[in-house]
Amino acid sequence: MVQYAPFLLGKFSDPLLAIMVGCLSYYVYERKMGRPQGHHLHELIKKRWDDRK
């Protein structure tokens, strides 16, 4: 029988925490690298979302 590792915060809270930490770390990475105007993640997502409509 397989024994699962215990949860850090909870069954649903752990994945949400992982997503939040990942998004925050990518935000810090983008700020550190100094990406050119119009090439930030939120701008690219917004552009793709607007093209979809």
Swiss-Prot record:
The chain crosses the membrane at residues 7-29. It is found in: Membrane. It comes from the Eukaryota. Keywords: Membrane, Protein transport, Transmembrane, Transmembrane helix, Transport. InterPro entries: NCE101. GO terms for biological process: protein secretion. Disulfide bonds: none annotated. It is a single-pass membrane protein. Its main location: membrane. It holds the Pfam family NCE101. One of its GO terms (cellular component) is cytosol. Belongs to the NCE101 family. Involved in a novel pathway of export of proteins that lack a cleavable signal sequence. May be part of the export machinery or may also be a substrate for non-classical export. This is Non-classical export protein 1. The gene is NCE101.
